[in-house]
Amino acid sequence: MIDKQVIVIGAGLAGCEAAWQIANSGIAVKLVEMRPLNSTPAHHTSEFAELVCSNSFGALSADRAAGLLQEELRTFNSLIIQTADKFSVPAGGALAVDRSKFSKSLTQTLSAHPFVEISRFEQLDLPNKKNITVLATGPLTSDELATKIKKFTGIDSCHFFDAASPIIYGDSINHEIVFKASRYDKGDPAYLNCPINKLDYFNFRNALINGEQASLKDFDKESANFFEACLPIEEIARRGIETMRYGPLKSIGLWNPNWGDLFDRENRLKKRPHAIVQLRKEDLEGKLLNMVGFQTNLKWSEQKRIFRMIPGLEKAEFVRFGVMHRNTFLESPKLLLPTLQFLKRETLFAAGQITGTEGYAAAAAGGLLAGINASLLAKNKNLVTFPNESMIGSLMNFISNRNEIMSNQKKNKFQPMPASFGLVPELTNKIKDKKLRYKAYQERSLKELQVFKKVLDASFKNDQLLVEIN
């Protein structure tokens, strides 16, 4: 007999979303979170869904992959995206949040939900198979539970090294050098920009690649396995003299009006900086600023010394230094069904970054699907998968046994995947223009999801609760 209370292990983005979906379907949830009793190298608080890396969910526009994923989540009343929208901060064309208010609100909302029981302890083993369970422990799953998961699956977990960027006090920067602008003047001037000339750039790069690294278990800078979309800044610097200028330090599309006429070619070539470091608001007031793209494993003393070489940051005061940590994830295509159930146990679901999705919205998407299906299983109803044409559906296909290449061939190495239009099926009528093609993907997805949502709503008819977000 199945226990009707669903257990969700981990109150990160995926776990919070799963718990919300389950509780709002009228099913009792026990949400288990080990913090603050047992924290991780990357966490600083005991709040739910603490954003340990960037405070950005990616592009807002629905004709971008990340933006489409956000819009799909809004369609299904995602707690994560609704809360992100509520506590958003200016970030040009991206959805960025005040991470403190975001996490506190999620904690309060779920703690106040009548169908959610919060349990603060470290889960040391997988619950009994009679318990419907959502495993949403994230990339920083505790060692003991990770060992039990390995024993259950019979497969070693994969890993990569991830890092967080430093945060500095906004009133410690030099505003005579730093200027406000968004790339290509899109939206409000949401970023602060630190221009760097050629000589300063080369001196800065030299300091970066020779900076002393923090010691980290199993980490060797010569052989470490990184996630390519979130490389440490010193690793980017090591890959080539100009590599940073084509990544987080690119200056294209950024211009300070004090430099004169942008459209005067001679002036533009003379005044354009060799590189630019961008700072993004962590809160509405701009009291805290994130160094965009500056994930790092440098020692804290080295971060202070080297990052103060950046023009405008000579007297920067650091709220938080960057840190690196080891991220663990499952070889999901060999373990999961498209419903996010484990092949070996129908009552056990997995969701979030532990499944090999990358990005905050993708983690929420996994929690959304796992939560919906855990609810359906508890109600003895048929489980669902999202349409292949949707970003949610295509991501879940990639991390499940529908990904035939990854699930059947030992030679291919499974790596985390963010939202990408490369995952969705081709259009019936091919469109060469990229912008028009992406727009067509968006329209097709949202149209398919409206049909899917009607079917799903019928499954939950008379069951759903209307609970407001704090």
Curated annotation (Swiss-Prot):
The keyword Protein transport does not apply. It catalyses: uridine(54) in tRNA + (6R)-5,10-methylene-5,6,7,8-tetrahydrofolate + NADH + H(+) = 5-methyluridine(54) in tRNA + (6S)-5,6,7,8-tetrahydrofolate + NAD(+); uridine(54) in tRNA + (6R)-5,10-methylene-5,6,7,8-tetrahydrofolate + NADPH + H(+) = 5-methyluridine(54) in tRNA + (6S)-5,6,7,8-tetrahydrofolate + NADP(+). GO terms for cellular component: cytosol. GO terms for molecular function: flavin adenine dinucleotide binding; tRNA (uracil(54)-C5)-methyltransferase activity, 5,10-methylenetetrahydrofolate-dependent. Transmembrane segments: none annotated. It is found in: Cytoplasm. Keywords: Cytoplasm, FAD, Flavoprotein, Methyltransferase, NAD, NADP, Transferase, tRNA processing. Its EC number is 2.1.1.74. FAD binds at G10, A11, G12, L13, A14, G15. InterPro entries: FAD/NAD-bd_sf, MnmG-rel, MnmG-rel_CS, MnmG_N, TrmFO. Its main location: cytoplasm. PANTHER family: GLUCOSE INHIBITED DIVISION PROTEIN A, METHYLENETETRAHYDROFOLATE--TRNA-(URACIL-5-)-METHYLTRANSFERASE TRMFO. Catalyzes the folate-dependent formation of 5-methyl-uridine at position 54 (M-5-U54) in all tRNAs. Belongs to the MnmG family. TrmFO subfamily. This is Methylenetetrahydrofolate--tRNA-(uracil-5-)-methyltransferase TrmFO. It comes from Prochlorococcus marinus subsp. pastoris (strain CCMP1986 / NIES-2087 / MED4).
